[in-house]
Amino acid sequence: INDTIDTNKLRENIMENKLQNLFSRCVEELKSIGIDINNNKLIGEINISLAKRNAKRYGCCRHEDPDEKYKVITKKGYKRYITYERFNKNYIEISKWVMELNDDIIKNTIMHEIIHCFPYCNNHGKEFKKYAGYINTHLGYNVSRLGNKEEDYKKSNLEYDIPQTTPNYKYKIECQKCGKYFFRQRYNKNLTRHYRCGFCGGKLKIEN
């Protein structure tokens, strides 16, 4: 048991070192096109690490210490909502399974999460797309809103097991254009009426 624990710890240390090195390369590449993320006037402090749990997602970015200069107040009826569009501390976590992929795919994931640290880029809206487009054009990345796990595994010469529907999912949804499957526990009629496939924009249908 101790040997297994030591082996897993060593593997995680190797992944962590690789992650830090690739992050440094991303920082240098951004600097080469005029984006200095070490400039605290532009962006807050960024810390990057492996995710503690091996989640299905590629990575995530958590924010702390909101910048009062970027405070946004919106009103809806009698209610007032406060949001912040810049944070002084940002914490990026990358899933361990991502670290098994090609370096270019790992860097693409890192760059995606770095963009979320920029002001007004908490979501995948206009500002996120602007930065992603600029980075893709000038550095040859492929930063997008969604990743394609199956294709990324193939590019990395790794076997990918296509997930099948399980008892946890009541509804199986298929894109009529590209054939991708999505699984949901609940069904809303607006899903097929107003939503489209995140990969190709095709219409969705419920499979029986």
Role assignments for model-derived ranges:
Residues D3-N108, C117-N208:
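Active-site-proximal or metal-binding-adjacent scaffold patches in catalytic folds
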Residues E113:
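Walker B catalytic acidic pair
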